[in-house]
Regions:
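Surface-exposed patches in mature extracellular/periplasmic domains of secreted proteins
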Residues: 51-54, 95, 121-130
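Substrate-binding/active-site groove segments that recognize
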Residues: 70-93, 109-110
Length: 158
């Protein structure tokens, strides 16, 4: 009887440690910072908050001060030239590229741009490719049978 009690205690303790470890692992490796901004802006622009958070995770690892080799800035890694286009579309006055380091604005701009791309492309792979490589580059890929079977979706990303 005593052995069964010890086994049960051990199993409960083991289960607790496993659950705690998994939770800690995900919180460390997949932090959900800026949750309110992500949910609010994803909702405004018709995006899935998890989709937006995953882009932020891949693009900047939730670092609001990230700058890529190509000059993309902030959480969602937006190029200043793209940001100027977005600022105009959103009616943001006196935009300057340093504003891209402001998490709330960067998430708003990124969600706006995703909505813009969603109107132009029909599937997630093509939308994400356009977000990363640029709309013009993706249009070139779509014309190439090596990358697209139908001219509207990518079968592979170069």
């Amino acid at each position: 009887m005593k052995n069964k009690f010890l086994v049960v205690i051990f199993l409960l303790l083991f289960a607790f440690v496993c659950v705690f470890s998994v939770d800690t692992f995900y919180k460390y490796n997949y932090p959900l910072k800026y949750k309110e901004d992500i949910i609010e802006n994803a909702s405004v622009f018709g995006e899935n908050p998890a989709f937006v958070a995953s882009i932020i995770r891949v693009e900047s690892r939730f670092n609001p001060n990230a700058i890529s080799r190509r000059g993309a800035m902030g959480l969602m890694q937006i190029l200043p030239s793209t940001a100027e286009f977005i600022a105009e579309g959103l009616g943001v006055k006196n935009f300057f590229k340093g504003m891209l380091f402001e998490p709330s604005l960067n998430i708003k701009f990124g969600c706006y741009y995703l909505k813009f791309l969603r109107k132009k492309f029909s599937d997630e792979k093509t939308i994400l490719s356009a977000y990363n490589a640029g709309e013009g580059v993706v249009r070139t890929w779509l014309k190439d049978e090596q990358y697209s079977n139908n001219g509207s979706t990518l079968k592979t990303v170069p």
